[in-house]
Amino acid sequence: MCVFFGECNKVCEHSILAGMDMKEETRLLVIARRNAIPNDERIARSEKACEELEQYFSRTVASGARIAAYHAMGSEVDIAPFAKSAHMHGWTCAFPVMMRDDNDAKDRMTFWDVPLDGTRRAFFDKPARAVTPDDPSLAGCTPCNPREIDAVIVPMVAFDAGNMRLGYGGGNYDRFLRELRSDAVVCGIAFREQEVEAVPTEPHDLALPKIIVA
């Protein structure tokens, strides 16, 4: 089994883990490639991607819009520069929170408005974990109805030329994107090292309308 990477440098990498499914294999290989990007380069390329993201939303999203952003984990594209400057366009940024549901075996991804003050720092200082609505880390934050979100920035593990996306396996964004209004602007963001020849897909998977490549 092999996966091909890059547009100019498509190198076949053979799995050494017997019995691993194609999606898991792709995740491990691509995350390793993303982790190998030097930190200084990752920061510079993230900043450039944020500039492109800001230009794109300036053309497609109205002032006063609410944008579902994210806080970068590990070696993901860091969109913090975009989140910090969004208010200059009149945009509000919401961030994902895994919400614990006692009536459901699975935690649910929700989005919350996080103010541009010490609240945001305290919010991000908490490790990724499932919480309940009364968790102290959410003090000063406001939950968002998916129908009130005007645009979404989608992180990912891998993508291909057809804009198919591979996530981390929880299905959180797959479910969330289906809850949005039909006119919501959806934009993925990733490093070029995350491109593969073909993302392993299932019949229900949908391509993203746009992906900004850093």
Please state what every model-predicted region is:
Residues M73-S75, V157-A161:
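Short glycine-rich anion-binding loops that position phosphate/pyrophosphate groups of nucleotides
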